Amino acid sequence: MAPEPAKPATNSEVGFSYELGVDIEITEGNWQSVRFAKAIAPNAEAKTQDGQTYDDIGADHPIKVGESWTLTLEIQHQRLTDGKYLPEVEAFKAATEPDALGNKATVHVRWYDKPATGKANPDDAYEGFGTVSITRSQTGTNDIGGWNITVTGQGPRKKIKNPLNAAG
């Protein structure tokens, strides 16, 4: 007799790719949600040093000494009646202008669990400062345009309280 299929965990629900929120700090303390976003992909990669000793009997022994992080996303092209883009896109773009050097080329972002229904995970939220690169996406002859944005971390990301839980 074949074994019974595994039953889903009780009181749990499947998570979806769209259940992640991103904000950019437009001015100090003024966070703007990034709207019309997709393909949001935060990444943190350990920076290691070799800690191998004879006790490891030839095996690797990487020791985490820090991390590098990036946040990539795509924002659908939206234009306001005055011709400008959404405020969050304007903030990302401003950090990539030719005269944006040093702190002018730095943005403050946060990303966090944002479920479609139910409570947000209070422990799945981060923020950091980073340098921005931006390119156009969806550039076909009849595509809905967009922006591919990559924020490359300057220093470590910081664990924060999920802003959705703080608000509610």
Residue ranges and their predicted role:
Residues 40-42, 110-159:
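Short beta-strand and beta-hairpin "edge-sheet" elements
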Residues 85-125:
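Short, acidic/charged, Gly/Pro-enriched secondary-structure junctions
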Residues 2-80, 129-144:
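Solvent-exposed edge beta-strands and adjacent loop segments
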Residues 1-11, 144-168:
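Protruding loop/beta-arch "assembly-hinge" segments enriched in small, turn-prone residues
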Residues 64, 93-101, 152-156:
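Short, surface-exposed linear patches
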Residues 49, 71, 100-103, 158-162:
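Short, surface-exposed, polar/charged, turn-prone segments marking secondary-structure boundaries
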Residues 78-84, 157-161:
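Short, cysteine-centered beta-strand-loop-beta hairpins and adjacent loop/turn segments enriched
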